[in-house]
Design a protein with these regions (language model features):
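Substrate-binding N-lobe of the ribokinase-like
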Residues: 2-14, 46, 50-117, 332
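Structural motif
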Residues: 26-28, 131, 160-163, 192, ...
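Short acidic, glycine-rich surface-loop motifs adjacent to enzyme active sites
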Residues: 158-171
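Positively charged, low-complexity intrinsically disordered leader regions
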Residues: 1-42
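A short, aliphatic-rich alpha-helical micro-motif
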Residues: 20, 156-157, 200-204
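Conserved phosphate-binding/catalytic loop of the ribokinase/pfkB sugar-kinase fold
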Residues: 108-114, 121-156
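Conserved phosphate/ATP/ADP-binding segment of small-molecule kinases
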Residues: 169-267
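Conserved post-catalytic alpha-helical subdomain immediately downstream of the catalytic base
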Residues: 243, 247, 273-336
Length: 339
């Protein structure tokens, strides 16, 4: 399939995007504070063969599952994130960035025994040079999982879609997944998962997972078993749907676009919509946020995937943890070639 739209598809997609503003999405996952250190490099250190960064400024953004929430908000939807932060300096900074970005803070669970996850990226001359991670990845306590579930119970009736964002920082555990999926099915809410490779066996019964190519193959090996010969990607997609009882699997393929497998037998190959790629960090968050919004606004899964592909094409053309706006997405639909 070429990356083109018919006139009727354009009208349909524009109607879906216009519907984002009434959508409510519950986002559960690992909260991360993203720190960006911006500077210039003009010399090598005399102490060791490493560049010296002359720091010009620093910025902070809500990351992890909060980047999904931020993408939803940027696209005019309403996000209700739930996750864990520490009672520390970075936790306070994270809450401040959430409020600054207009992200709801009612789902925060505080844990004084854990540090707030901080990812520091050093960027010079538009290039990321190094990243530092400060975190604790052990499982979140059962007491705090129950606090998350209490929030889910309070909110799920009024939500349109549930997104589970698994960064492997301790929130996503089998108990939590089972309870959330059970509640979502009770109230007929789709559940979308941005997966962690090592946790694929947790995702049984969700609506859709959105792995990248590496995660799809790693998840296949974890849930189905090792292979003697590397299987084709289509075999991986169908096997995951069958094994995990999914409605669909959307595999993101970087510069090769995406491929969607649907339980009923449909395969949709979607070429990349990106014109230029500056930074792929956060693109997966944009994809799952846009799919959630589109489904809630009445899209079919293959339509949601194509709209999400356009949104991802916008954010990879920006540096840093970026988002797309409804205006940018609307323009991308209008700009798409005709067929």
């Amino acid at each position: 399939m070429k990356n083109t739209l018919t006139a009727s598809e354009k009208r349909r997609f524009l109607d879906i995007i216009a519907g984002f503003r009434t959508v409510k999405i519950l986002v559960i996952g690992d909260f991360i504070l993203d720190q960006f250190v911006w500077g210039n490099v003009s010399r090598i250190s005399p102490e060791a063969p490493v560049p010296v960064v002359d720091v010009k400024r620093e910025s902070y953004m809500p990351g992890g599952s909060l980047n999904v929430a931020n993408n939803i908000r940027s696209l005019a939807g309403s996000a209700f994130p739930c996750g864990v932060v520490g009672r520390d300096l970075y936790g306070r900074m994270l809450v401040k960035t959430m409020r600054h970005q207009g992200i709801e803070t009612g789902g925060i669970v505080y844990d004084p025994s854990r540090p707030t996850t901080l990812k520091t990226r050093v960027i010079a001359h538009s290039q990321q040079m190094v990243r530092f991670d400060r975190e604790k990845t052990e499982d979140v306590s059962l007491a705090n999982l129950n606090k998350i579930l209490k929030f889910v119970h309070q909110m799920i009736r009024t939500m349109d879609v549930v997104v589970l964002e698994d960064y492997g920082k301790g929130v996503m555990q089998p108990f939590l997944l089972r309870e959330v999926v059970k509640l979502a099915k009770k109230f007929k809410k789709p559940v979308l998962v941005d997966p962690k490779e090592k946790h694929f066996d947790y995702y049984n019964g969700v609506t859709c997972i959105t792995p990248n190519r590496k995660e799809a193959y790693g998840g296949y090996e974890r849930t189905i078993g090792p292979w003697r010969k590397t299987p084709e990607l289509e075999a991986v997609g169908w096997a995951l749907i069958k094994k995990l009882k999914l409605e669909s699997v959307l595999v993101t393929l970087g510069e090769d676009g995406m491929i969607l497998f649907e339980k009923k037998g449909r395969v949709t190959k979607i070429p990349t919509a990106a014109r230029e790629v500056y930074d792929v960090s956060g693109a997966g968050d944009t994809v799952i946020a846009t799919i959630a919004l589109s489904l809630a606004a009445g899209a079919k899964m293959h339509e949601a995937a194509r709209i999400a592909n356009m949104a991802a094409g916008i954010v990879v053309g920006k540096l840093g943890t970026a988002t797309a706006s409804p205006e940018e997405l609307t323009e991308a639909v209008r700009r798409a070639g005709s067929r």
